[in-house]
């Protein structure tokens, strides 16, 4: 699973996701992609599950780019612990995704296969997504 090797701070504020994505909103590498349509926090496990679904459906053909990286730690207190006594230990890593952000890109497969693979990957994510394709130039 993806997580940073080193961070400046161990814990992060919860934060809010405002606005729409300005960077990472267009296809940069592949011919087809999966674009987020709503603001959401996506965990490293969800990204990995979607990546596995993609590569398995493509039967290892083509190329996959993951355009998001979980760099925000989410802390959690242990079960049945009273409130107070500080913030819990870092539990998982998430990425804050704004609407319009491209999550995955693929290339080297047929358009029909690409759409099927990205639909399977989208089912693993807690977010409404859209299939996008590069316009033929």
UniProtKB/Swiss-Prot annotation:
It comes from the Bacteria. It holds the Pfam family Ribosomal_L16. GO terms for cellular component: cytosolic large ribosomal subunit. SUPFAM superfamilies: Ribosomal protein L16p/L10e (SSF54686). Gene3D superfamilies: Ribosomal protein L10e/L16 (3.90.1170.10). CDD domains: Ribosomal_L16_L10e. One of its GO terms (molecular function) is tRNA binding. Keywords: Ribonucleoprotein, Ribosomal protein, RNA-binding, rRNA-binding, tRNA-binding. One of its GO terms (biological process) is translation. Part of the 50S ribosomal subunit. Binds 23S rRNA and is also seen to make contacts with the A and possibly P site tRNAs. HAMAP family: Ribosomal_uL16 (MF_01342). Belongs to the universal ribosomal protein uL16 family. This is Large ribosomal subunit protein uL16. It comes from Nitrobacter winogradskyi (strain ATCC 25391 / DSM 10237 / CIP 104748 / NCIMB 11846 / Nb-255). The lineage of its organism: Bacteria, Pseudomonadati, Pseudomonadota, Alphaproteobacteria, Hyphomicrobiales.
